[in-house]
């Protein structure tokens, strides 16, 4: 859809390519989320797509929502910025750590979504399975209402931070973000190469007095192996030479840099 971060950034990238890459005829298309975008790449309906690096990994490896539907042709141009896995509870729940969630009502994301896979993998790192919790398959819009109404105890959301929906809950409630401890994060990164560590700085949300250690997946630009190296190079060079245009389109682009463009690269890189 047009409400997220991909659409304004896609428009900016199309603009950059049309001005800097000879013969480019780029336009931004409003699509579904990462899974839909992988399918569009596979069907040759688009040449470049924004996807989360975890979804790209599942596609190339034929796992999770791509079980029995492997898409080996997917390649990466660059990873762009983090999509933080935020684990939200309210102060009154008394939950201070993921070790405390056994027996609790946990919203893990919509069934079959990237968020749901993130939640399952993180809980697994803590030795917790869905049998140990009361699992609720809710989108974050549904989960935020359920948190406010006291119908769930903890909710997972994967989104660049600060996330508007969490800010919204925090206006009326004392929100607490649960950390992913460093040793657990290291174990997750060793097993799933799409994860990276990051810190949600103190004061990102109201009442948040301390930094919170988190892990993130990364938004990336994906193509297929049909894109030749020269084109891949020209596109990547144009984008990284015009980052100011991206930053003007959306604040998440402040995190985009050449230095981190291979962080969390979970699929083969286009030779360009």
Feature locations, PLM:
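Pocket-flanking alpha-helical
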Residues: 11-15, 27-68, 95, 141-146, ...
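An extracytoplasmic/periplasmic, membrane-proximal ligand-sensing/linker region
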Residues: 138, 142, 149, 159-179, ...
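A structural signal for short loop-to-beta-strand junctions that line the ligand-binding cleft
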Residues: 67-80, 204-213
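Bilobed "Venus flytrap"/periplasmic-binding protein-like clamshell domains
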Residues: 1-25, 82-149, 244, 267-272
């Amino acid at each position: 859809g047009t409400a997220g971060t991909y659409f304004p950034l896609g428009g900016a990238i199309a603009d950059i390519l049309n001005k800097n890459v000879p013969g480019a005829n780029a336009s931004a298309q409003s699509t579904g989320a990462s899974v839909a975008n992988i399918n569009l790449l596979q069907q040759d309906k688009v040449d470049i797509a924004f996807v989360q690096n975890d979804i790209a990994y599942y596609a190339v490896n034929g796992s999770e929502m791509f079980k029995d539907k492997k898409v080996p042709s997917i390649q990466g141009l660059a990873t762009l910025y983090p999509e933080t896995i935020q684990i939200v509870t309210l102060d009154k729940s008394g939950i201070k750590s993921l070790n405390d969630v056994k027996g609790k009502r946990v919203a893990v994301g919509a069934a079959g979504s990237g968020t749901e896979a993130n939640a399952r993998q993180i809980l697994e790192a803590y030795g917790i399975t869905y049998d140990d919790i009361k699992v609720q398959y809710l989108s974050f819009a549904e989960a935020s209402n359920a948190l406010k109404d006291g119908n769930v105890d903890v909710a997972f959301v994967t989104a660049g931070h600060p996330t508007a929906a969490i800010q919204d809950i925090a206006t009326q409630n004392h929100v607490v973000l649960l950390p992913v401890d460093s040793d657990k994060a290291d174990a997750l990164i060793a097993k799933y190469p799409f994860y990276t560590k990051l810190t949600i700085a103190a004061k990102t949300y109201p009442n948040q007095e301390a930094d919170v250690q988190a892990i993130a997946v990364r938004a990336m630009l994906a193509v297929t192996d049909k894109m030749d190296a020269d084109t891949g190079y020209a596109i990547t060079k144009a984008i990284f030479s015009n980052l100011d245009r991206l930053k003007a389109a959306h604040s998440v682009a402040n995190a985009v840099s050449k230095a981190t463009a291979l962080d969390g690269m979970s699929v083969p890189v286009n030779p360009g």
